[in-house]
Regions:
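A short N-terminal beta->alpha junction/helix N-cap motif
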Residues: 11-19, 43, 61
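N-terminal alpha-helical segment
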Residues: 4-5, 51, 73
């Protein structure tokens, strides 16, 4: 996707989903008018995000500091799980709950501040929370979330890293 500028991607994925198709069509027309047929095709392939994905994209694009903290925390959680450190897991789990709650509140605030016409009371914040929890559990999902180009919410139903740590009986 080298033909599509980062600025354009950020502009499209930070805008509310109801305006995505019109903005994408305008960008395609602009690229065609500039003689960039390959760029126009690439822009035309971009998928419209769901409202939940848009909220996560807002976090990634406008609060990269908090998203970096999420990724750091996910690495710490995986390490504590791999090393079977119960006390550390409990501490990190409390931090996880606080950070996810902060991120969900930030998503709501960003939507409300940036786009006053968005019905804040009907935002799918549970899907946002599920996506953030999935990002904590899976490295690939975390990278998708951090990209700011998510097109749909994600959930995770696993039990930790695969392969699981080798357990041994201590007598």
């Amino acid at each position: 996707m080298a033909a599509v500028s980062r600025d354009l991607l950020e502009r499209l994925y930070a805008a509310p989903p109801d305006g995505f198709v019109a903005a994408r069509s305008a960008a395609v027309a602009e690229a065609r008018a500039a003689g960039d047929a390959a760029g126009a095709r690439e822009i035309g392939k971009l998928r419209k995000p769901t409202v939940a994905a848009w909220l996560v994209n807002l976090l990634a694009l406008r609060r990269p500091d908090l998203m970096a903290e999420l990724v750091e925390l996910s690495a710490a959680l995986r390490a504590a799980q791999r090393e079977l450190r119960g006390a550390r897991l409990r501490e990190l789990s409390a931090r996880r709950r606080d950070l996810v709650a902060t991120l969900v509140a930030q998503a709501r605030a960003l939507a409300e501040a940036s786009y006053p016409d968005v019905p804040v009371g009907r935002l799918p914040l549970t899907e946002v929370e599920a996506t953030l929890q999935a990002a904590l559990s899976d490295v690939e999902i975390a990278e998708q979330v951090r990209s700011g180009r998510l097109v749909r919410a994600v959930s995770y139903a696993g039990f930790g890293e695969v392969p699981r740590p080798q357990l041994r009986l201590v007598t």
